[in-house]
Amino acid sequence: MLKRASFVEVNTASLRHNFSAVKSIVPKDAHIMAVVKANAYGAGAIKASEIFLQEGANYLGVAALDEALELRSHFPKTPILILGYSPNANASMLIDNDLSAMVFSLEQAEVFSQMALKSQKRLKVHLKIDTGMHRLGLEPNFKSIETIKKIRALKGLEVEGIFTHLSNADAKIKTHAKNQMKAFNAFLEQLLDQKIEFQYRHAYNSAGILSLCNGNENRFLNLYRPGIMLYGFYPSNEMKESCPTILKNVISLKAQIVQIRSVKKGEFIGYGEHFYTNEETLVGVLALGYADGLMRALGNRIQVAINNQLAPLIGKVCMDQCFVKLNNIQAKEGDEVILFGDKSAKANDASEIAALLNTIPYETISTLSKRLERVYI
């Protein structure tokens, strides 16, 4: 890859540490699906997957076909599940690349089966059950049992898994999450009563792993799906404050100062007259902008770390560049700037940036552009 003056630094030791944290919580005989959608939440899907597989991951989880195909080109034998919706038009690519798909309707299952039979193959599928998130899935009721019987009878499919998704397991009060698991477990018991079993049964995301593995709600589960915790973040501030598990920061957004210029008093910096120089101002220009994932709204709102000093980000963030004020800062062209990342360097971490923008760290890191090089340390 061509070098740029901005990049995402990824701490591989932290990736390994966080995966080990998952292994220390889930049952010893459990399978682990490392969720690496959205370019591994910004960390780089190929390298992150390689590390998780080395550490013992049994499965990889993504959201869409393009993500799955990228992984398949590097990991020809690794099980890969597309957790999101797969259009019928994608069926042949799912089959040809030995990918597993999420299914939630008989109609789609029939299309997938027909396509698989034409290829003289079988497509692996996982059935999605909606236990209370009300997004996608079959309802956990008698009608769905009949639907599942019909899906399992389709000769072009291998129904290897069944799963649900917890919508609120990161809350302080776990009532909704426990009710979801109660519904899922009851449904699994009804299926077992009719001798319907699955190789994989899964429900716990990071929030479930961190907060619900000490009860018996997971008694039927044998596969766990860690996501955000692998990249060093807790699913919510409540969990961060109460959870004994230590997670380590993985991602830092960095850029070099490409030019330093002195701007006289009484000038505006950047687009739209959003920063006025009320004194002679030393301005450092960074080759990093909102097209790279540095939110435009952060201009005039955060401080960045330069040589263990804090300097304000000024003006509006441009598409490809931004500005820092260097008055009283020891810095030169080529010096490294940490926009967010490891707090040991005085920088904000992604959760603090997210709080400032009234969002979550998932968004802060997963929107980091692929045009930024990932540098692994």
Swiss-Prot record:
EC id: 5.1.1.1
Enzyme superclass (EC): isomerase
N6-(pyridoxal phosphate)lysine: residues bearing it: 37
Catalytic activity from the UniProt record: L-alanine = D-alanine
Its job: Catalyzes the interconversion of L-alanine and D-alanine. May also act on other amino acids.
Residues the entry annotates as binding substrate: 135, 319
Claim: Isomerase is one of the keywords in the record: yes
PROSITE patterns: ALANINE_RACEMASE
Catalytic machinery residues: 37 (proton acceptor), 271 (proton acceptor)
Pathway: Amino-acid biosynthesis; D-alanine biosynthesis; D-alanine from L-alanine: step 1/1
Entry GO terms, CC: cytosol
A GO biological-process term: D-alanine biosynthetic process
InterPro entries: Ala_racemase, Ala_racemase/Decarboxylase_C, Ala_racemase_C, Ala_racemase_N, Ala_racemase_pyridoxalP-BS, PLP-binding_barrel
Lineage: Bacteria, Pseudomonadati, Campylobacterota, Epsilonproteobacteria, Campylobacterales
Keywords, comma-separated and alphabetical: Isomerase, Pyridoxal phosphate
Pfam family, one: Ala_racemase_N
UniProt cross-references to Gene3D superfamilies, sorted A to Z: Alanine racemase, Lyase, Ornithine Decarboxylase, Chain A, domain 1
Annotated organism of origin: Helicobacter pylori (strain P12)
Record-level Gene Ontology MF annotations: alanine racemase activity; pyridoxal phosphate binding
Database matches in HAMAP family: Ala_racemase (MF_01201)
Family: Belongs to the alanine racemase family.
Segment forming the signal sequence: none
Descriptive protein name: Alanine racemase
Cofactor(s) the record lists: pyridoxal 5'-phosphate
